[in-house]
A protein has these predicted regions:
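Charge-rich, low-complexity N-terminal segments
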Residues: 1-99
Length: 99
């Protein structure tokens, strides 16, 4: 594993929390469909794996949100990338805080 990515997708849906959640849920399902280790949080979803695959997933998230019916989407991405591998895993970063 040479990368981890935290992604927050914000569909441009006004005053409709149910619709916003539905679209975000579709994006999360898309992310999970790749079978990578994924942690869903209240503000962002974190995934780890190969950098190139993660970038493809990030690019696809916007398309999934648009296809799900939102007219526009803002996406915030945090990336940790170490070409030689051995980035800290999600579990190494947070497991001590979730006991």
């Amino acid at each position: 594993m040479n990368a981890s990515v935290a992604i927050q997708v914000l569909p441009a849906v006004k005053d409709d929390d149910k619709e916003l959640c539905r679209i975000v849920d579709e994006v999360i399902a898309y992310i999970k469909s790749f079978g990578l280790y994924t942690v869903v949080g209240p503000f962002e979803t974190t995934i780890e794996g190969d950098y190139d695959q993660l970038m493809e997933i990030v690019a696809g998230c916007q398309k999934v949100a648009i296809k799900a019916g939102c007219p526009a989407v803002s996406t915030y991405v945090k990336i940790v990338y170490k070409p030689e591998g051995d980035v800290l895993s999600i579990d190494e970063k947070i497991s001590k805080h979730n006991k």
